[in-house]
């Protein structure tokens, strides 16, 4: 219930002191706040925690743009949770370690953020986090016993006040309370007035009215119900007492505070919910949960139905920059790993003609009898031939005679080098069209009749349509680029803009398909340079986990695009970029030290799907047969990547999916469950934790690479008719479940 605890965000100062009934803990979200008690003032800056104990006088004074948040526990709630509430007097001291302070702030930030977001299961998640917060305080924040913290003149009067706070909803009397402390009624009444300046009945009614105000503000309960549950004998008695203390009737008081909901109460002043979430992100850190923070439950029933649709796997094209990079043994190993895991068989290299022209025009002459100007190129070709990779070369600035001559020398040499071995699958890729290309392609096709020509396709290509038509018989594929980051302004928080960006890749694909149709061009497409929303910095690109978004794009593209491009690794990729924004145009498979990025595992998991589709919807696809099938579930949420700048982003949501696969043949099934999400397989978090100003040593590198893998669970399950699976889906996560029935014995 709301009356058990309050979760608030405050942007305005308190004018007067209040005496707290209960326990309050909070921290400064932004700016500076002065926390006053009866005798002292404590200056708190951003991130500082404050605690106010039961019966303390307190007041907040917020400096300009200051924001604080707090959780206030009612005494009755604490009494229900703890055997002895007198032990709940907390004090932050040097004994409270920085780690524990961070953890307290972490829990509170998540709690306030959950409260603001107000999702389907926010109330349950709040209650879990509240318990976690109290447990952490009990274990890690120093406490003193109540008897050392008396704020009144007499301990017995203090006991009576505590008793009233815990039992105000009951039928209390002065005689009952005097018996409780062993005094006469007259003596208790006298001591009460001396200590508090008010009589017993006045104090009791004040306590009841304060609790009733909370119910009037935050619940829809009837006034009669509120009266009875706060200790009044009737609605009429409640109304009289309420008006005496507030000069308003309960109905008038409630009417002055319309439409205050649990999620609105935290968003005060001129701060939007999302701004508060973004500010709270700075205080949320990764932590091991002993409480599940499930925010949504989804039930999915699947029965396989025959379909005419097939899932097409992609031809993966890996960019390596300069051809000589293939001499690097680490890069060779990475390519072979890709080839083994998801059938990579094509390498795209930059133009070698400038390199050859430089050698051909050198001031000294290479003697063919004692040297070979193509020595390093031949070693690269041998690696490709040995491992059945095809080579695609990006030609650039090929409109000069010197370039064409160098091209012919190079192509002739390659043809001679591979003539005594199996054929090399050789392709040329051009991004601009020039008439000199006709001569070059004719020469190339004469020596490599099975060679391919890739042509970049965009709006500008239409200006060269006649030349494109002449080249069409030689063209194998059209190539294009698409970057969702180009569609948004990351300084804005407009959700509609990010929704538009989520469709950018598929929209451009459809546009090009329509362009080809209008001009009667029929060739398969290759998406070479592409990216989903990542932000425009290296940090957002790493922190914003987007595995599910990438899977979503691959599924949408599988029937429209034949090839998908990636850079091999971070070092090769970044060395060919002008700036961070340019870097965001593409995705690489490896980080440094052979660390596999999540996109690597996304491609690996996608490759485990087979062609026959048994079921599909917006977040799930099942392929295979009824006895050997693959279930792919994913979450794809597109939002501003800057909201993900935290190890455990505040836009993170957790969904429990109860999945039933119906009408299966009875038997024992083997389950292999891969989980790729922010907590399983995300390289960037581990990398940053183990990276020092001097880099990483071998132990750290090996550990990070071992731990940065999808989670794998393997088990057998006996199925009669329905296979039931429970899947915890984190924002933008992926679950690939392979199911195979054992043969009958």
From Swiss-Prot:
Residues 158-256 form the HTH araC/xylS-type domain. Residues 175-196, 223-246 bind DNA. GO terms for molecular function: DNA-binding transcription factor activity; sequence-specific DNA binding. Pfam families: HTH_18. Keywords: DNA-binding, Repeat, Transcription, Transcription regulation. InterPro entries: Glycoside_hydrolase_SF (IPR017853), Homeodomain-like_sf (IPR009057), HTH-like (IPR037923), HTH_AraC (IPR018060), Tscrpt_reg_AraC-type_HTH (IPR020449). Disulfide bonds: none annotated. PANTHER family: ARAC-FAMILY TRANSCRIPTIONAL REGULATOR, HTH-TYPE TRANSCRIPTIONAL ACTIVATOR RHAS. This is Uncharacterized HTH-type transcriptional regulator SAR0107. It comes from Staphylococcus aureus (strain MRSA252).
